[in-house]
């Protein structure tokens, strides 16, 4: 059992190093190592100042005991100088540590955002729901906690490095001041303990650490769960904000309140469990800390009362004992932070490993072979499955020649949208061959995506900038029936809520006019429009000068007249696939 525990600790430290190492070998490594070296240097200097304050206590209290007025003011002057230096050291140690933290967080955030967005990993993550919850929370919060807690626990003012250096710095002082303790053993004589205060501090701290570790272990699991519950609750609030109109039209406030209450209930219940566990830990740590104040005086008083040491020696010894005991009690004083750190490392490490695995899958040979070449579209012997392995479609064959318009129909839920996902290369479940013409591709979903920002940025999405003239943008808006919005192109707003679904679909057709794709895929992209405007937009595309190949998904019977061919893919339905009949 002990060996398994040690193995887990080593695995945890390896995981911390695996997460931390990339930054310190990155392009920002020079600044990272310089800041780290300065922070460590200030940390070591602060320990030196603690040693100087320890010797000052000896001189100061001896001066008081001797009623030396001149010596008193000299010691006050020395203290003032040491205090000023300590203040400057503490301020810059914290400031430079925070500078390192924000640079590290910035680099990690860019790195994780890159992993999340590259190879459409964000999409594959949501297909395998349950394996990695709330990736947004892991990027925004867990990275922040990882950098701040790692630096705090390792090189911070009360971190591991400070504790180790403080321990060895005061060991010699404590050993030399404590003398020997003679323990009578009756007829066996006397047993002498050299440097007995050091051994008392060691036993005191090790015993306290062992007890704290035993009663605090469940905090790791509880902190891990708390972060997940907090993220789930926050996500439900964001979902309401993004769908305010739909909820209002449904009158869904009671249901939303139930969802919020249930999710927040998990937050509260788990927090109560954390509170109860911390209460148990605090009973022990508060007792341990308070008794540590008087303990060195109890064990040092015999030497002072027998005039073996002066008052200054007593105070110096008590301070040295406190420094050794505090440094040895690092795990006790930091256990809550360590538990949170372990939870963050687990979440962040699992998230990174999952992203890397999905990225490797995406870059490997895909069972659905999507190639660019030839003309139009060709789908050959394509099988499509759901993420859980349930078969959707089998042996799909579909063709669309250059400039042709093909309509794909079928019952709801049969896999029409999944077919378009496979053609776009983002659906990994299945096998077969898809050949696409070389040229621009554009996919229009039923509900267009409108990014945050101005209406102009929504119009040219996914491009961040464009050199298209203003007249070209206005012409596209006018052709799709959005001329009234032309004066508002540079207005920054939440356009996904300001525009109706029909207006959003018109805007997506304006994107088509600006992009001029060779292959255009429409997934019920006109479902919110009336039949007359739907026909108008389709005729506009069919008559476009660049003659795009069009593949549409739709249910309206009027769409057939706007296409050259129609394919009902229900003939490819797998026997095990459940279908909802419209």
Predicted regions and their residues:
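Extended non-transmembrane interhelical loops and adjacent amphipathic helices
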Residues: 1-21, 102-147, 228-270, 342-355
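Membrane-integrated ABC transporters
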Residues: 1-50, 59-79, 93, 97, ...
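Transmembrane-helix motif of ABC transporter permease domains
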Residues: 28-50, 66-106, 127, 187-217, ...
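A hydrophobic transmembrane-helix motif
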Residues: 38-41, 45, 54, 159-187, ...
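Primarily ABC-family ATPase nucleotide-binding module
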Residues: 131, 346, 352-407, 430-437, ...
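Cytosolic ends of transmembrane helices, especially the final helix of ABC transmembrane type-1 domains
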Residues: 216, 220, 231, 246-252, ...
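ABC-family ATPase nucleotide-binding domain "signature/switch" substructure
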Residues: 422, 458, 491-582
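Conserved "ABC signature" C-loop
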Residues: 448-494
């Amino acid at each position: 059992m002990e060996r398994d525990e040690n193995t887990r600790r080593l695995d945890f430290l390896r995981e911390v190093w695996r997460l931390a190492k990339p930054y310190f070998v990155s392009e920002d490594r020079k600044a990272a190592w310089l800041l780290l070296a300065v922070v460590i240097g200030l940390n070591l200097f602060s320990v030196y100042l603690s040693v100087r304050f320890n010797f000052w206590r000896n001189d100061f209290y001896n001066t008081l005991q001797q009623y030396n007025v001149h010596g008193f003011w000299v010691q006050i002057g020395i203290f003032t100088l040491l205090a000023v230096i300590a203040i400057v050291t503490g301020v810059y140690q914290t400031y430079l540590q925070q500078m390192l933290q924000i640079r590290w967080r910035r680099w990690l955030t860019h790195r994780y955002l890159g992993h999340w967005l590259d190879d459409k990993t964000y999409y594959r993550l949501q297909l395998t729901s349950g394996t990695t919850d709330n990736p947004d929370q892991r990027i925004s919060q867990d990275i922040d906690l990882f950098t701040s807690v790692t630096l705090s626990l390792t090189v911070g003012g009360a971190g591991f490095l400070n504790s180790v250096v403080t321990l060895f710095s005061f060991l010699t002082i404590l050993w030399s001041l404590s003398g020997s303790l003679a323990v009578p053993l009756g007829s066996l004589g006397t047993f002498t303990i050299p440097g007995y205060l050091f051994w008392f501090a060691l036993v005191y701290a090790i015993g306290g650490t062992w007890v704290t570790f035993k009663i605090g272990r469940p905090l790791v699991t509880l902190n891990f769960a708390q972060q997940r519950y907090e993220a789930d609750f926050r996500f439900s609030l964001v979902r309401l904000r993004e769908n305010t109109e739909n909820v209002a039209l449904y009158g869904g406030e009671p249901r939303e309140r139930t969802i919020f209450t249930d999710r927040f209930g998990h937050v509260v219940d788990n927090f109560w469990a954390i509170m109860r566990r911390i209460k148990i830990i605090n009973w022990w740590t508060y007792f341990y800390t308070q008794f540590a104040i008087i303990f060195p005086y109890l064990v040092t008083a015999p030497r002072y009362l027998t005039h073996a040491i002066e008052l200054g020696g007593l105070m110096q010894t008590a301070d040295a004992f406190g420094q050794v005991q505090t440094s040895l009690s690092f795990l006790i004083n930091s256990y809550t932070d360590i538990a949170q750190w372990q939870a963050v490392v687990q979440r962040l490490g699992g998230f990174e490993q999952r992203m890397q695995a999905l990225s490797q899958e995406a870059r490997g040979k895909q069972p659905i072979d999507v190639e660019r070449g030839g003309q139009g579209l060709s789908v050959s012997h394509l099988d499509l499955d759901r993420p859980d392995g349930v078969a959707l479609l089998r042996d799909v064959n579909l063709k669309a020649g250059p400039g042709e318009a093909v309509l794909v129909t079928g019952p709801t839920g049969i896999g029409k949208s999944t077919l378009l996902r496979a053609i776009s290369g983002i659906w990994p479940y299945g096998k077969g061959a898809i050949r696409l013409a070389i040229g621009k591709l554009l996919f229009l979903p039923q509900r267009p995506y409108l990014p945050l920002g101005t209406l102009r940025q929504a119009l040219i999405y996914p491009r961040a900038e464009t050199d298209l003239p203003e007249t070209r943008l206005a012409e596209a808006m006018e052709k799709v029936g959005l001329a009234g919005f032309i004066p508002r192109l540079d207005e920054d707003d939440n356009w996904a809520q300001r525009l109706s679904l029909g207006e959003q679909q018109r805007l997506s057709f304006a994107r088509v006019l600006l992009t001029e794709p060779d292959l255009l895929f429409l997934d019920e992209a006109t479902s919110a429009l009336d039949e007359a405007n739907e026909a108008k937009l389709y005729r506009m595309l069919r008559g476009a000068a660049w003659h795009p190949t069009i593949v549409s998904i739709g249910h309206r019977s009027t769409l057939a007249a706007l296409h050259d061919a129609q394919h009902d893919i229900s003939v490819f339905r797998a026997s095990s696939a459940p279908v909802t009949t419209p």
